[in-house]
Amino acid sequence: MSQKLSVVIPTLNAQHVLPSTLETLMEGVFAGVIGDLVIVDGGSNDATLNIAKEVGAIVSETTPSRGGQIFAGVFACKCDWVLILHADSRLSQGWVELIPTAPDPERAYYFQLQFDAAGFAARWVATWANLRSKIFALPYGDQGILINKNLLASIGDYPTAPLMEDVILARKLGRRLIALPIMITTSSEKYIAQGWLRRGFRNLALLFQFLLGTTPEALYKKYYS
């Protein structure tokens, strides 16, 4: 990539997953692709902030809302291109070489999902996520997104909703979303804890309720309060 990019990571008690995510970004630092790293924390009570400060990130703190945290992070970025990652989603080795040299500023890019777990269930859920993204132009936040700030501004900036912020963004971008041939590995911890089928059904139920008109605020209150 000929231009530098900023990386934005929203965090909340991410001490166990953040270090490995940051490690995968090092090749971008060494290649001169990453201009700055912005970590926006939602009130962690573990070592997340210390980890962020140790690597020289621009650190800010706000109320816990992933959409709001990402919005604040994008605002603090110094580069025109922004790579938004979840704290538990890691880019595969060699990702720098597969990023387009001159990405289209009128397009947004996402990655191919896989889980850090073996087995049929993990492969099935990841396959569905990648098909959903391709067929319906609906990648989720754990697939990462590379977007130009001008494009983001043209669609009303990053959604600040407490839930479904990634779906709102994807629906605004539509067919301007392009899949990159780069794997991104996300944590399977919640799926394993709750059960792959139960967690998958819950996510699908959330999506359907949102598409049928339930507000993100109401969904957040229902599922997280």
Outline where the language-model segments fall.
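Cell-envelope/extracellular polymer assembly enzymes that use nucleotide-activated donors
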Residues: 4-6, 36, 168
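A conserved acidic beta->alpha catalytic loop
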Residues: 41-49, 89-90
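Hydrophobic helical membrane-anchoring modules
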Residues: 1-2, 171-225
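Short aromatic/hydrophobic "clamp" motif used to bind/position activated sugar donors
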Residues: 82
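Conserved donor NDP-sugar-binding/catalytic core segment of glycosyltransferases
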Residues: 93-121
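Short, well-formed alpha-helical segments that are part of the catalytic scaffolds
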Residues: 13-29
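Acidic helix N-cap motif at the loop->helix transition within catalytic regions
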Residues: 16-19, 46-55
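Short beta-strand/loop segment that forms part of the nucleotide-sugar
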Residues: 22-26, 33-43
